[in-house]
Amino acid sequence: MCGNNMSTPLPAIVPAARKATAAVIFLHGLGDTGHGWAEAFAGIRSSHIKYICPHAPVRPVTLNMNMAMPSWFDIIGLSPDSQEDESGIKQAAENIKALIDQEVKNGIPSNRIILGGFSQGGALSLYTALTTQQKLAGVTALSCWLPLRASFPQGPIGGANRDISILQCHGDCDPLVPLMFGSLTVEKLKTLVNPANVTFKTYEGMMHSSCQQEMMDVKQFIDKLLPPID
């Protein structure tokens, strides 16, 4: 994604309709690509925001009998006590931090960037935001969990993002990443960052997917945190 994996294509991008003064970087779920999410953001875009939907590298995934598929890091199991791919998660987070740095070089300050993702991508967006020294505007974490949660402190994190705004969304009928994981994650997040800035929304009948109401909530969150500045 950042020169370390030549087989990963360039991100799907929804360019700003005028000069970009803010950006959303959104990470897809396991086995997917950024294209579908770029289409979704094209439907809720604001003219001063650039939407960047990178594609994960293709790699074998333990959970899926070692079949190769787009994956930000290896997934060994989907229960809260499953072993985790610590080195893969940390390397993936470094790649996302490099992507943020690239946008800063392009003239968008990091505090005008929202990081987000769905499922595995949402997990990576949370982990990256909580471990980076880049001050971000917020995180939109959809149908996901916090990876390596035991590696975080018992109390608030230090660093740039202890007051970050987080919108976490989950379907109440999710069979893959159960709602309970979302609830446990939001409770943990409230101990790590200012709990007043953490919002948890659930969607009745929604499975491991998205819905129109959720995208409207995501748009409202983005537009509130990244207003036009000109």
Swiss-Prot record:
Pfam families: Abhydrolase_2. Its EC number is 3.1.2.-, 3.1.2.22. The active site is at S119 (charge relay system), D174 (charge relay system), H208 (charge relay system). The keyword NADP does not apply. One of its GO terms (molecular function) is palmitoyl-(protein) hydrolase activity. It is found in: Cytoplasm; Cell membrane; Nucleus membrane; Endoplasmic reticulum. It catalyses: S-hexadecanoyl-L-cysteinyl-[protein] + H2O = L-cysteinyl-[protein] + hexadecanoate + H(+); 1-hexadecanoyl-sn-glycero-3-phosphocholine + H2O = sn-glycerol 3-phosphocholine + hexadecanoate + H(+); a 1-(9Z-octadecenoyl)-2-acyl-sn-glycero-3-phosphocholine + H2O = a 2-acyl-sn-glycero-3-phosphocholine + (9Z)-octadecenoate + H(+). Keywords: Acetylation, Cell membrane, Cytoplasm, Endoplasmic reticulum, Fatty acid metabolism, Hydrolase, Lipid metabolism, Membrane, Nucleus. GO terms for cellular component: cytoplasm; endoplasmic reticulum; nuclear membrane; plasma membrane. Its main location: cytoplasm. InterPro entries: AB_hydrolase_fold (IPR029058), LYPA1-2/EST-like (IPR050565), PLipase/COase/thioEstase (IPR003140). The modification N6-acetyllysine is found at K224. The keyword Methyltransferase does not apply. GO terms for biological process: fatty acid metabolic process; protein depalmitoylation. PANTHER family: ACYL-PROTEIN THIOESTERASE 1, LYSOPHOSPHOLIPASE-RELATED. Belongs to the AB hydrolase superfamily. AB hydrolase 2 family. Homodimer. Acts as an acyl-protein thioesterase. Hydrolyzes fatty acids from S-acylated cysteine residues in proteins such as trimeric G alpha proteins or HRAS. Acts as a palmitoyl thioesterase that catalyzes depalmitoylation of proteins, such as ADRB2, KCNMA1 and SQSTM1. Acts as a negative regulator of autophagy by mediating palmitoylation of SQSTM1, decreasing affinity between SQSTM1 and ATG8 proteins and recruitment of ubiquitinated cargo proteins to autophagosomes. Acts as a lysophospholipase and hydrolyzes lysophosphatidylcholine (lyso-PC). This is Acyl-protein thioesterase 1.
